[in-house]
Amino acid sequence: MVLARVYYELFSHEAEWLDAHSGADAELGRQLRLEMTDGSRVFIAWAWGADGDGYHVEFAPHSFCAGAPEVDRDVSAWPLWSPLVGQPVTLSYVGEGQQVLAIRAAGAAAYCCSFGRGVWGMDELRVGDRPPQHDREPARGT
């Protein structure tokens, strides 16, 4: 899979924040979309466990969200993503619990995870240039 473009699918209030902080780590309430040179897409978002009692970062060839995003922001040229664009990428989980997903290519990486701003959380996807540092693991079943 060769990465062609990267999009943040956003709510309008998230777009306002990103406009003021372009290139920074982001916390997305909706999802991330990777588009490949062969036309395929990979969506990355929060998902509940099969029993509805756990959460994790998940990726799939289909959208996790109903309806179109309020804002569709192309972030391919941002410093986090530009080293990956045009390269074959791999997606793999880091650690246990599918809480951190690494997107890697040619010595560069971006991380999608459940940890941001000092706490484990859900309903947002943190996207950044390094894996999270945290004080505690998320509680099972929460």
Regions found by a protein language model. Give the residues of each.
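Surface-exposed, interaction-prone regions used to assemble/regulate multi-protein complexes
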Residues: 1-142
